[in-house]
Amino acid sequence: MQSELQRGFVLHRRPYSETSLLVDLFTEESGRLTVIAKGARAKRSSWKSVLQPFTPLLLRWTGKSTLKTLTKAEPAAITLPLQQITLYSGFYVNELLTRVIESETPNPALFQHYLKCLTGLATETNVEPTLRLFEFQLLQILGYGVDFLHCAGSGEPVDFSMTYRYREEKGFVASLVKDNLTFYGRDLLAFEALDFSDDAVRQAAKRFTRIALKPYLGDKPLKSRELFTQNILLLK
C-alpha cells in the first residue's frame, strides 16, 4: 500500500547494496521510519542530492513491513543553512530522535517542535536555548513526568532560593547536599516555564536533560557529541 504524500526530513542515511541507500526519515504523520531508496547512489540519481538532512521534503513510500520502499522524494523548501556549531547541533537533534522515539509512532506535535528547532538553529546566534527547549519538549512527549513546582518530599512549593536534589522516579527534594544532582529552585521554576534566556539556567537545564535522557539513550555514547568535541579540538 502506498502512503499519502507527507512532509518529512532525513535523519540519517547509509549505503544499502551497491546502488541504494537506507534512509531514516522523520515524517509529520507517520513519525520515524526507515526506507530503501533504490538507485539513490547511482551517478545520475536525482535522489542523491535530495535525500540530505535538514532539507524539508515531500515523501511517499510503499510497503507493509517495517522496511518500506521510497517512491517519491522532492524538496518542499530550501535546505536549512546549518554550519559548524549549528550543523553539529542539528546532527545531535537527529540522533536523539533516531535513538529515543519508537518507529512508526505518529507524533505531529513532535514534528512541529523539530521543525521549529531546526529553524531556530538556522536563525539564532546562540544554539543553547533552542536545544534546551527541544530536549524538554522531547522529554514531555516521551512521558517523562517530573514536578518542577513542588518538593517531592514535603509537597511544598519550590522556593526560588533553596536547593533541591533530583531523585530518579521521585522528583526534586529539598537538600543542602551540592553535587551534580542538585539544582536551585530558580532553575526548576524556569524549567517549568521553559524559559532558557538566562545562561545559568541553560547550564542547569543541560545538566538535567543529560540525566533525564540517559535511561532512553543507554550507555552508548552519542556520535554527534563526539564529532562536535573533535571539531572543537581541531579549531583550537
Swiss-Prot record:
It holds the Pfam family RecO_C. GO terms for cellular component: bacterial nucleoid. InterPro entries: ARFGAP/RecO, DNA_rep/recomb_RecO_N, NA-bd_OB-fold, RecO, RecO_C. Transmembrane segments: none annotated. One of its GO terms (biological process) is DNA recombination. The keyword DNA damage applies. It comes from the Bacteria. Keywords: DNA damage, DNA recombination, DNA repair. Belongs to the RecO family. PANTHER family: DNA REPAIR PROTEIN RECO (PTHR33991:SF1). Involved in DNA repair and RecF pathway recombination. This is DNA repair protein RecO. It comes from Haemophilus influenzae (strain PittEE).
